[in-house]
């Protein structure tokens, strides 16, 4: 024997049918999350399967079934852990060029080499299901031509996965590129694919709160290509200052210290914990509306969040249910089971016009079941409207077999 190698592998099909992502032939709903390579103690990602098993387990507790790696590709230990846990992964090439992506021969050659290496090294892992060429890539005609060539090359090298030119390419302004296997963006042209975006647009900012909004018009623009939301959420909560002492590695939390000093100077420290809980509860409710709006949209393949983990880059983005250390925040709003209640394979939806009614007005709602579990639901759906212990109305409906 000259040499010997051992590799684990798995068999699965990840494709598309009727404009929807499918996993082993069944319609699949992406409950994704963006990981931005935030590891504040070490400054680099874990390199062992055990450590990645713990990282992925934290995400899975919140209902995540697919992890997107924002403009980077994790080590093989991440893929091995995902294989064990049944998680799916979407790595990206390390490109975040918002001006002239792939327009030079040098950059095109570099990213082609990276693409070939990723597919060569990780092709045996069934958890590896999608890849994009980078994050929010913007470019000119030559760059788009090279991006299309790389997508076709990836498909030729390994047709068992789905590929796209970019995540939120051209910020969604130009729509589908005509070559990618899926479309993920914040919008399709001027039609939103999430509830909020800059500058204060989206139905959460501009419409009366209710539960009938969806993204049907935007999702229908891709011409039968699967579509899912990009970096959905980004709702912040006040920081918990107790976490400051846990920064013992290379990251200095001077941003959190500055906020604490201001709170002490203005007197806000006296009611700070109440503010943490209130802002976090609002963030949780906004995340729920984001998720349920996607579920209310026929034809969408899900969404990818940003994010469940606080993001200390680009200033301070305290957007997570978990802090920068991937630890659930010590507050009721951040309990994993609360988020997973609506970020789940099966979710009951009540669609109504608004949350506030006056005495004498009729309340009407449509009940739906978003079922992306492994089993078809059968039997009656029981509903009840109550005020305290007083039942105002109740009944049963036939449960639809999926949505």
Question: Whereabouts are the PLM-identified features?
Answer:
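N-terminal carbohydrate-binding accessory modules
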Residues: 1-60, 80
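Short linear motifs in intrinsically disordered
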Residues: 6-16, 154, 158-159, 191, ...
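Generic detection of short hydrophobic beta-strand segments and adjacent strand-loop junctions
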Residues: 7-9, 174, 395-401
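Well-ordered beta-strand scaffold positions
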Residues: 26, 83, 388-390
């Amino acid at each position: 024997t000259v040499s010997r190698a051992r590799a684990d592998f798995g068999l699965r099909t990840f494709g598309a049918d009727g404009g929807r992502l499918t996993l082993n032939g069944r319609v699949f709903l992406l409950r994704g999350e963006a990981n931005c390579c935030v590891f504040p103690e070490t400054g680099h990602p874990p390199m062992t399967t055990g450590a990645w098993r713990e990282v992925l387990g934290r995400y899975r507790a919140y209902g995540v079934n697919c992890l997107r790696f924002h403009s980077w590709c994790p080590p093989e230990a991440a893929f091995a852990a995902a294989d064990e846990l049944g998680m799916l992964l979407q790595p990206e090439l390390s490109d975040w060029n918002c001006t002239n992506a792939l327009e030079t021969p040098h950059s095109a050659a570099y990213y082609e080499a990276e693409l070939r290496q990723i597919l060569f090294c990780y092709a045996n892992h069934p958890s590896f299901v999608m890849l994009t060429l980078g994050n929010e890539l913007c470019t000119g005609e030559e760059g788009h031509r090279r991006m299309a060539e790389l997508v076709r090359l990836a498909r030729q090298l390994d047709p068992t996965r789905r590929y796209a030119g970019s995540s939120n390419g051209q910020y969604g302004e130009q729509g589908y590129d005509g070559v990618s296997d899926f479309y993920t963006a914040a919008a399709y042209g001027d039609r939103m694919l999430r509830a909020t975006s800059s500058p204060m647009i989206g139905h959460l900012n501009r419409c009366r709160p209710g539960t009938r909004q969806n993204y049907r018009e935007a999702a229908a623009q891709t011409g039968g290509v699967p579509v899912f939301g990009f970096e959905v959420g980004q709702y912040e909560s006040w920081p918990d200052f107790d976490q400051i002492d846990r920064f013992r590695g290379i990251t200095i939390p001077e941003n959190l210290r500055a906020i604490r000093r201001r709170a002490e100077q203005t007197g806000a420290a006296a009611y700070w914990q109440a503010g943490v809980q209130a802002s976090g509860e609002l963030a949780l409710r906004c995340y729920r509306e984001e998720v349920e709006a996607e579920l209310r949209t026929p034809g969408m393949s899900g969404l990818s969040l940003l994010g469940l983990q606080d993001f200390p880059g680009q200033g301070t983005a305290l957007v997570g249910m978990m802090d920068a250390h991937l630890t659930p925040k010590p507050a009721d709003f951040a309990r994993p089971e609360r988020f997973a209640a609506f970020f789940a394979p099966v979710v009951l939806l009540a669609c109504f016009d608004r949350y506030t009614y006056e005495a004498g007005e009729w309340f009407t709602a449509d009940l739906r079941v978003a079922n992306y579990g492994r089993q078809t639901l059968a039997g009656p759906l029981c509903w009840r409207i109550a005020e305290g212990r007083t039942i105002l109305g109740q009944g049963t409906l036939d449960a639809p077999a999926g949505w």
